[in-house]
């Protein structure tokens, strides 16, 4: 039996808390860095070898893609929390049921969303006020990209299973392989074969397919409670209900929040393709802070899920403090780095000075306030890990969706400029940080009383 096949479940119910969280979070953070590299490399190569209009076309569809993927990732997080709780309770039968039900659901969801996205590509792009001069390229990119959704969704569910078992390094490894392949294929399809935005979408799809194959192969040969058997990928009714009860609030939360960002993107689109390109450039950079932070939130949910399942409430409290230290230092640190090195970073994407100007403007409004998101996401992960996924859903829907929609409808017409669009983010982050902190304090009081 190889070392690979002897892989063990990593339980977080004992040992040094800070060390456990840090070493579990690092592969997740790096994994999200690599996942963000998929779209970032597309943008860099498209911007430099095809042009600013093509870059704007890819950027204008990014929010649609994010809505779909984020919703599915929310469900994967919910499944991961259920698996983590079953592992913490040392219930092997429920672990087996949760793993295979999660994969069955992700396959069905992947097929449905792939078909819907392919059929509705043009109406979705047109609904976002996409300028006519980039409309066709936007439709082409999103249509081709939609056929890779099933691979992305299935991979994210497998990664959720690996992360729930404490094996975040394995999903990082496969993302590293896929990211290198993505860069090579981007250069081949865009630079050599001159395939434009279509080449970027095809390269991303192939890379995601390979990540899916690599990770599936691993979970089929591993020798632990999370081993996958193809014939056992079926729905277990009671477990499906439990997973959906946990995953749907997180999925809806992500989807609706991202939908509000689609409205914001639509507001940006009216300012022309150079503003779209600049805003799109910054969103790619922004992903290197936001997505890894979501990984820290996932680590928090996994840690709390296992310890809550084992009844270790005091350990939960200490773990959340450690998570806050990691989350706030990371987000604030990345924000500072972005501001200090803004010129070389932004120049990677394009030589268009107008696009770079708008990207830097977004950076000035976002980077100084990233620390607020550290509080929001760490507390959200902790609350979700305790099985209370409805609470962070309500808080984030209010802060990141309802508040932002009201801003777009009432504040933006008064401000009537690009800066008015940008300002909604730091203000909504502050609202969410305050509300989520209060909810976490209330939760801990209840848990400590019943411990």
Give each language-model segment a name.
Residues 50-63, 138, 142, 201, ...:
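Small-residue hotspots at the loop-to-helix junctions and early N-terminal turns
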Residues 1-25, 83-148, 192-248, 304-369, ...:
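Short alpha-helical transmembrane segments in multi-pass integral membrane proteins
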Residues 23-42, 144, 178, 207-211, ...:
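Transmembrane helical elements of multi-pass membrane transporters/channels
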Residues 40-43, 115, 157-161, 183-188, ...:
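Alpha-helical transmembrane segments of multipass membrane proteins
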Residues 12-50, 63-78, 82, 107-114, ...:
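N-terminal transmembrane alpha-helices
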Residues 37-55, 125-132, 188-195, 255-284, ...:
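Helix-terminus/linker motif at the lipid-water interface of multi-pass membrane proteins
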Residues 76, 145-163, 171-179, 200-213, ...:
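Short runs within selected transmembrane alpha-helices of multi-pass transporters and secretion channels
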């Amino acid at each position: 039996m190889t070392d690979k096949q002897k892989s063990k479940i990593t339980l977080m119910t004992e040992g040094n808390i800070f060390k456990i969280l840090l070493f579990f979070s690092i592969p997740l953070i790096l994994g999200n860095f690599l996942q963000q590299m998929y779209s970032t490399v597309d943008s860099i190569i498209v911007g430099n070898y095809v042009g600013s209009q093509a870059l704007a076309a890819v950027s204008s569809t990014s929010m649609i893609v994010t809505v779909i993927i984020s919703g599915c990732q929310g469900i994967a997080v919910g499944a991961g929390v259920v698996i983590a709780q079953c592992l913490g309770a040392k219930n092997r039968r429920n672990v087996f049921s949760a793993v295979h039900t999660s994969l069955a659901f992700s396959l069905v969801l992947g097929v449905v969303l792939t078909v819907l996205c392919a059929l509705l590509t043009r109406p979705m792009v047109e609904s976002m006020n996409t300028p006519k001069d980039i409309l066709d390229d936007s439709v082409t990119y999103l249509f081709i990209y939609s056929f890779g959704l099933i691979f992305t969704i299935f991979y994210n569910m497998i990664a959720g299973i690996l992360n729930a078992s404490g094996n975040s390094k394995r999903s990082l490894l496969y993302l590293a392989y896929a990211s290198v392949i993505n860069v090579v294929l981007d250069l081949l399809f865009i630079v050599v074969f001159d395939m434009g935005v279509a080449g970027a979408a095809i390269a991303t799809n192939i890379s995601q397919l390979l990540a899916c194959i690599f990770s599936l192969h691993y979970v089929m040969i591993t020798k632990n409670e999370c081993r996958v058997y193809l014939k056992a990928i079926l729905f277990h009714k009671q477990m499906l209900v439990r997973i959906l009860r946990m995953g749907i609030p997180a999925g809806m939360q992500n989807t609706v929040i991202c939908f509000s960002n689609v409205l914001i993107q639509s507001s940006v689109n009216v300012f022309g393709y150079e503003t779209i390109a600049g805003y799109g450039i910054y969103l790619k950079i922004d992903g290197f802070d936001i997505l890894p932070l979501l990984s820290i939130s996932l680590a928090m949910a996994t840690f709390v899920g296992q310890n809550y399942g084992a009844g270790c409430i005091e350990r939960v409290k200490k773990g959340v403090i450690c998570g806050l230290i990691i989350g706030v230092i990371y987000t604030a640190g990345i924000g500072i780095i972005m501001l200090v090195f803004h010129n070389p970073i932004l120049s990677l994407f394009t030589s268009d000075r107008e696009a770079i100007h708008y990207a830097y403007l977004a950076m000035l409004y976002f980077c100084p306030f990233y620390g607020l998101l550290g509080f929001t996401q760490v507390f959200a992960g902790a609350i979700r890990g305790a099985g209370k996924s409805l609470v962070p859903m309500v808080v984030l829907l209010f802060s990141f969706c309802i508040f932002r929609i009201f801003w777009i409808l009432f504040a933006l017409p008064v401000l009537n400029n690009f800066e008015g669009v940008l300002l909604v983010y730091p203000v909504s982050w502050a609202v969410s940080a305050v509300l989520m902190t209060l909810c976490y304090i209330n939760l801990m009081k209840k848990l400590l009383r019943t411990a």
